[in-house]
Regions:
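The N-cap/first-turn positions of alpha helices
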Residues: 2-5, 29, 61
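Helix-turn-helix DNA-binding elements, focusing on the entry/boundary residues of the two helices
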Residues: 17-18, 36, 50
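A short LG(V/I)-centered, amphipathic sequence patch enriched
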Residues: 40-57
């Protein structure tokens, strides 16, 4: 199961800073920036308001993160059940 998109968005929402989120995800800052920008283009809605280096969730971003966290929790429960 690959929930990379959800992990990236949730981590950026948690840290509010692209560089810190990228470090936590073990990817480069430019790679995360491009990924988030492309995701927002594909969704047709911004998930984050950018204020300098600070990233703040939009209303759509808040809804996205709410569902993404639920998906990540289900993934964890699934993995715990299957691989225990």
């Amino acid at each position: 199961m690959d929930l990379r998109e959800q992990k990236y968005v949730c981590t950026l929402a948690e840290y509010g800073n692209l560089t810190r989120a990228a470090e936590r995800l073990y990817i480069s800052q430019p790679a995360l920036s491009i990924y988030i920008t492309n995701l927002e283009k594909n969704l047709g809605v911004p998930l984050f308001d950018r204020n300098g280096k600070k990233f703040v969730l939009t209303y759509a971003g808040e809804r996205y993160v709410e569902k993404a966290r639920a998906m990540l929790q289900l993934e964890q429960e699934f993995n715990d059940e299957v691989y225990s």
